[in-house]
Design a protein with these regions (language model features):
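Type III/flagellar secretion export determinants
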Residues: 1-187
Length: 187
């Protein structure tokens, strides 16, 4: 029995296009399906195109957008994280990227580190999402040890012989850890 990827309309996403690589289809599919998946539950979620990064989980009813604060500078990496929480309430919080401990942070804080280190591609988001799934976090606000979960996911990649993903995850993780060390945060 074979397993196929089926989109929300019951169509194999690879069957919808011709003359493109699977990578191009996968990235286009990601942008069309994940980044625009608003309003699929009774609770409304919102993604904003003016944000540095915006993501949502209709299943949890949460949506988050990340912006640089007005006082942002390289020496003062302050971000505004705002959106809608699982209770349907709007929230806004100020996050200093220098004070984020990836061994005990929320997914939102991990994404601020992603933005601060220039990791804003769909692949970077999916790396972080894989860690969140490994952490079994029920909310973007739930804290977890994302370093531990990165090591676990990398261990899985190693066992499976998925060296491209292993090396990409390692490079991404090292970039985050280098930033954390340079910012002076120690734990």
């Amino acid at each position: 029995m074979s397993i196929k990827i089926i989109d929300y309309n019951g169509v194999d996403p690879y069957a919808k296009t011709a003359g493109v690589t699977k990578t191009e289809v996968a990235e286009a599919y990601f942008q069309k399906t994940v980044m625009k998946c608003t309003g699929t539950t009774t609770q409304e979620t919102a993604l904003y195109s003016d944000a540095l990064m915006s993501y949502a989980s209709p299943q949890m009813g949460e949506s988050v957008s990340i912006y640089k604060a007005d006082c942002y500078s390289k020496d003062n990496p302050i971000y505004v994280v705002k959106g809608i929480n699982a209770n349907g309430n709007e929230f806004e919080e100020i996050v200093d990227a220098r004070k984020i401990n990836p061994k005990n942070c929320s997914f939102n804080e991990l994404m601020v580190l992603n933005v601060e280190t220039g990791h804003t591609s769909p692949k970077d988001y999916l790396r972080a999402a894989a860690l969140r799934a490994n952490a079994d976090a029920d909310s973007y606000f739930e804290k977890a040890d994302y370093i531990l979960h990165a090591q676990e996911v990398m261990g899985d990649y190693k066992v499976l012989g998925n060296w491209d993903s292993y090396l990409a995850m390692d490079k991404w993780l090292q970039s985050l850890l280098d930033y954390v060390m340079k910012s002076g945060f120690r734990k």
